[in-house]
Amino acid sequence: MLCVRNSGECFRDHMRHMMRSLQDLKQIREPDDQSKCSYVTRARQKRIKQREQLSRLRISDVSDTSTYDSACCLASPLEEEEDQENHAERLAQGSPSSIKSLDFDSGYSEASWQDEGVVLRRTRNVRVSSSACVRTNRIRPKSTSDACLERWTSFEASDPTDWTTSLLTRGRNRQPLVLGDNSFADLIKNWMDLPECPDSAELKPSRKTAFLVNMRRKIAGISKGLEERRSAEAKRMSCPVGFQPPKPFFHQSHTSLHPMGTDFYQFSSVMKSGSRQPIICNDVIGYI
């Protein structure tokens, strides 16, 4: 019994010593945990600030593109150098997780991957900004549309009131066409803004066009004359116009006497002759 009591007391003493050692270890690790928590909060605040800066940059870019052309300028070399310097400073600082001891960070804690967040870094020769154009006045190379515009405007007429010249110079709008709810009305408005086309009487054809117009008029006159001649000609009939069929001798003069025909239809021929000679018919039914 005494041995059992002594062993129980020894076990209790061991347990008390273990609890004390655990409390001591906990007190030792508390400042490290506090420093870890403070680092986590600082990293979160840093990420929040970076997101706010990114949103501000986007808003500023959108506001600048509303007043300036977004495709007219490139990022200045000063901005590229600043980006490179900031990136080098970030690399020189190193990751804060490497300073921590391996006893308290097993590699799966939040602090171990906190420094691997998204780094706001603009790529080189890719970022297009209108504010850079305002600050450094670095003009972007001419595009294909600008080159075509200059080529067309170089051949413009000397007349300043030409509608083609005004369409290519003053009528060209750099801002894109934005259609609202009533897109048809917007299109009509843009169409009404175009200059009016002059009348055909005001247009003077050049020498080449005048030659072609005169040739067309001559050909039209020749074809018209042929049509008029054809219509003026008398229509040819199949039978002669002055032909007169033979009539009975009673109604004709002595120069054109025609003897009465003796055919099977004697009765009808005598009736048509109009003579007063009496008709003697033995077979009336046969004649009828």
UniProtKB/Swiss-Prot annotation:
Q: What is its main location?
A: nucleus
**What name appears for this protein in its UniProt entry?**
PAK4-inhibitor inka2
Which portions of the sequence form the region Inka box? 159-196
Output the Gene Ontology cellular-component terms: nucleus
Keywords annotated in UniProt? Nucleus
Using the record for this protein, list the coiled-coil segments as residue ranges, or answer none: none
Q: Which InterPro entries match?
A: FAM212, Inka
Subcellular location as annotated: Nucleus
Domain notes for this protein: The Inka box (also named iBox or inca box) binds and inhibits PAK4 by binding a substrate-like manner.
Q: What family, per the record? A: Belongs to the INKA family.
What does the record give as the function of this protein?
Inhibitor of the serine/threonine-protein kinase pak4/pak5. Acts by binding pak4/pak5 in a substrate-like manner, inhibiting the protein kinase activity.
The reply to whether Nucleus figures as a keyword in the UniProt entry is: yes
User: Highest taxon of the source?
Assistant: Eukaryota
Q: Which PANTHER family match?
A: PAK4-INHIBITOR INKA1, PAK4-INHIBITOR INKA1-RELATED
Please state the gene responsible for encoding this protein: fam212ab
Q: Name one Pfam family in it.
A: FAM212
State whether keyword Glycoprotein applies: no
Spell out the molecular function terms from Gene Ontology. Answer: protein kinase binding; protein serine/threonine kinase inhibitor activity
